[in-house]
Amino acid sequence: MTSLPLGVKVEDSAFGKPAGGGSGQSPSSAAATAAAVGADEEGAKPKVSPSLLPFSVEALMADHRKPGAKESSLAASESAQAAGGLAQPLGVPPGSLGAPDAPSSPRPLGHFSVGGLLKLPEDALVKAESPEKPERTPWMQSPRFSPPPARRLSPPACTLRKHKTNRKPRTPFTTAQLLALERKFRQKQYLSIAERAEFSSSLSLTETQVKIWFQNRRAKAKRLQEAELEKLKMAAKPMLPPAAFGLSFPLGGPAAVAAAAGASLYGASGPFQRAALPVAPVGLYTAHVGYSMYHLT
């Protein structure tokens, strides 16, 4: 508590003269007193060790100047693991091999280093691969990330035509009935009511069955007749001559054309024949001339 007035007194004696006329202290004694006051003030302040400030300039410079500290700590941890003889395989937490209830401690940084991997047994480095059950990470097994299994598309069901509920089942005709119906149709395609009743009773059929059979047989005969007429039309239809396309060749094809050109150039075949001027076939330009005359008129 006496340092403050002492400091004031020192300041007055150091930088100025005292107010009174008494003799002041000497400069050497004033400097010593100021140094003692500064030391007391520094001792009163709380001192912070550099270790408590990891981001201070001193701590950063110390880490930068000593790069071998981490390597020495890693080597020490590796040697401790080798001495203990408890090399843990990859992917196994440290507490799983020991007591199951013990809390798992964080892995050292040198656990996956080159030296640690070389010291591990081969069984720990090589995983057993089974084609039946491939290993998957937990995030791949979750349905959120793994794609859904492919669904097998069943073939579409064949939709059949639905018949009427009151439809009567089809009655098959016997061979004798079919022969009699066909013979009667060749004789007469249209039957009267009396003829149909008599004919149906002789075949043990109803009049409706005979009537429907004759209708279907007439439709079939009509289709066959139209097909025959179409064939006859195609057979009787003449092929378009080459003159329709602007070209006309004599009968015999290209071979006859070549022979005619050779005969017109060298005359008739035989010895001692003079060469004659080539004469074009008569019908070669007939179509072109007619086409031009038609447009000129």
Swiss-Prot record:
Question: Which PROSITE patterns does this UniProt record tie to the protein?
Answer: HOMEOBOX_1 (PS00027), HOMEOBOX_2 (PS50071)
UniProt's post-translational modification comment states: Sumoylated by PIAS1, desumoylated by SENP1. Sumoylation of Lys-9 and Lys-127 not required for interaction with H1-5, transcriptional repression, inhibition of myoblast differentiation, or binding to gene promoters.
Entry's transmembrane regions: none
Give the superkingdom in one word.
Answer: Eukaryota
Residues annotated as signal peptide: none
Q: Which CDD domains match?
A: homeodomain (cd00086)
Q: What ranges are recorded for DNA binding?
A: 166-225
Chief location of this protein within or outside the cell: nucleus
Q: Does the keyword Transcription apply?
A: yes
- Asked whether the keyword Nucleus is assigned, the reply is yes
Indicate, by first and last residue, each region the UniProt record lists as having compositional bias (Basic and acidic residues): 127-136
Family annotation (SUPFAM superfamilies): Homeodomain-like
Keyword vocabulary terms for this entry: Developmental protein, DNA-binding, Homeobox, Isopeptide bond, Nucleus, Repressor, Transcription, Transcription regulation, Ubl conjugation
Here the segments flagged for biased composition (Low complexity) are: 25-38, 71-95
Instruction: List every stretch annotated Disordered.
Output: 1-51, 63-111, 127-157
Q: Which molecular function term from Gene Ontology is one that the record holds?
A: RNA polymerase II transcription regulatory region sequence-specific DNA binding
Compartments, as annotated in UniProt:
Nucleus
Gene Ontology CC annotation, any one: nuclear periphery
Q: Which terms under GO biological process does the entry name?
A: embryonic morphogenesis; inner ear development; negative regulation of gene expression; negative regulation of odontoblast differentiation; nose development; positive regulation of cell cycle; positive regulation of odontogenesis; regulation of odontogenesis
Q: Which PANTHER family match?
A: HOMEOBOX PROTEIN MSX, HOMEOBOX PROTEIN MSX-1
Q: How does it assemble?
A: Interacts with CREBBP/CBP, TBP and SP1; interaction with these transcription activators may inhibit autoinactivation. Interacts (via C-terminus) with PIAS1 (via N-terminus); the interaction is required for the localization of both proteins to the nuclear periphery and specific binding of MSX1 to the core enhancer region in target gene promoters. Interacts with H1-5.
Family under the similarity heading:
Belongs to the Msh homeobox family.
Q: What does this protein do?
A: Acts as a transcriptional repressor. Capable of transcription autoinactivation. Binds to the consensus sequence 5'-C/GTAAT-3' in downstream activin regulatory elements (DARE) in the gene promoter, thereby repressing the transcription of CGA/alpha-GSU and GNRHR. Represses transcription of myoblast differentiation factors. Binds to core enhancer regions in target gene promoters of myoblast differentiation factors with binding specificity facilitated by interaction with PIAS1.
Protein's UniProt name: Homeobox protein MSX-1
Q: What is the lineage of its organism?
A: Eukaryota, Metazoa, Chordata, Craniata, Vertebrata
